[in-house]
């Protein structure tokens, strides 16, 4: 087992114990403050050299009224919903009529597979959803 003596034991008798002048070991005065203190005053040149992007704002936040946030559902999930609650939907010409807004969705997305022919009504459709609905023998109606 290695027996290592502590630094302070080695430094006994050296008056300042490795801290140079005695007053350099008091507080944070020797290093110009703790942490980022003085970065807009006496340490400004080091900020300019090593961290020039520390201060200032960059980019922007869009106004929330400009961001369109629609409730979405994938076409595969919609078919699962239809199969689960068959009695809640009307059938016209062999196609199930689904109004997505009545079940709380505004946009239909194209993830998943469908085999049921359906007429889907929604505010918006993705291109993939349109293709899959038509491929299954259904149609889409944008409100």
Swiss-Prot record:
The keyword Transit peptide does not apply. GO terms for cellular component: cytosolic large ribosomal subunit. InterPro entries: Rbsml_uL15_N, Ribosomal_uL15, Ribosomal_uL15/eL18, Ribosomal_uL15/eL18_sf, Ribosomal_uL15_CS. It comes from the Archaea. Residues 1-13, 23-38 have a biased composition (Basic residues). Residues 1-38 are annotated as: Disordered. Gene3D superfamilies: 3.100.10.10, 4.10.990.10. Coiled coil: none annotated. GO terms for biological process: translation. The keyword RNA-binding applies. Keywords: Ribonucleoprotein, Ribosomal protein, RNA-binding, rRNA-binding. One of its GO terms (molecular function) is rRNA binding. Binds to the 23S rRNA. Belongs to the universal ribosomal protein uL15 family. Part of the 50S ribosomal subunit. This is Large ribosomal subunit protein uL15. The lineage of its organism: Archaea, Methanobacteriati, Methanobacteriota, Methanomada group, Methanococci.
């Amino acid at each position: 087992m290695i027996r290592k003596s502590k630094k302070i034991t080695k430094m006994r008798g050296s008056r300042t114990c490795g801290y140079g002048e005695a007053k350099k070991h008091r507080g944070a005065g020797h290093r110009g403050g703790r942490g980022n203190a003085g970065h807009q005053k006496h340490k400004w040149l080091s900020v300019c050299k090593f961290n020039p992007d520390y201060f200032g704002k960059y980019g922007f936040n869009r106004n929330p009224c400009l961001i369109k946030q629609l409730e979405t559902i994938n076409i595969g999930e919609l078919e699962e919903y239809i199969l689960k609650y068959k009695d809640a939907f009307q059938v016209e010409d062999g196609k199930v009529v689904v109004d997505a807004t009545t079940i709380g969705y505004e946009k239909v997305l194209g993830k998943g597979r469908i085999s049921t022919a359906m007429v889907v009504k929604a505010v918006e459709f993705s291109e993939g959803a349109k293709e899959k609905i038509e491929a299954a023998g259904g149609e889409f109606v944008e409100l």
